[in-house]
A protein has these predicted regions:
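Transmembrane alpha-helix boundary signature
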Residues: 24-37
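Membrane-embedded catalytic cores of phosphoryl/pyrophosphoryl-handling enzymes
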Residues: 38-131
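A generic, lipid-embedded transmembrane alpha helix
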Residues: 14-25
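"…centered on the first transmembrane helix and the immediately adjacent amphipathic helix/loop
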Residues: 1-4, 20, 39, 43-44
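Juxtamembrane helix-capping/reentrant segments at transmembrane boundaries
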Residues: 1-15
Length: 131
């Protein structure tokens, strides 16, 4: 499935946010997990919410927002706890490859790719930092 028009992305993003909120509620009431997991989950939901708002006007890269969020989490974990620098480097390389593939496929322009990555990084770094 490929969603090329920005208008077609709104409903899938909205459904994803709803399911993540349901999952957050049930997992939070059933399982006890580390506060960092709670922060990551809320950061992902917030990132999706912002991409939903942006998508009404512009086609930001959701792929890059997701991997940017992953990079932001591990970057912050490296800063707080240490010992995950190899993951940080791996995710950064993977991010470059993903961004390159999105550009080659002409799915996004460079602004959309960089903006998506930056949004994901900033959102998840800020949420995980809130620990």
């Amino acid at each position: 499935m490929q969603i090329e028009e920005k208008e077609e992305r709104i409903l899938p993003i909205l459904f994803t946010i709803i399911w993540m909120l349901i999952g957050y509620y049930f997992l939070g009431n059933i399982l006890e997990y580390a506060p960092v997991v709670n922060s990551i989950y809320l950061g992902m939901i917030a990132t999706l919410g912002i991409t939903l708002l942006i998508t009404k006007y512009w086609k930001i890269s959701l792929h890059m927002a997701a991997i940017g969020g992953c990079f932001g989490v591990f970057l912050n974990l490296q800063y707080i706890y240490g010992g995950v620098i190899n993951y940080v480097i791996f995710i950064l390389i993977l991010s470059g490859l993903l961004g390159y593939s999105r550009a080659i496929l002409k799915a996004h322009n460079m602004q959309q790719i960089y903006s998506g990555f930056l949004l994901g990084v900033l959102m998840l770094v800020s949420f995980v930092s809130y620990l």
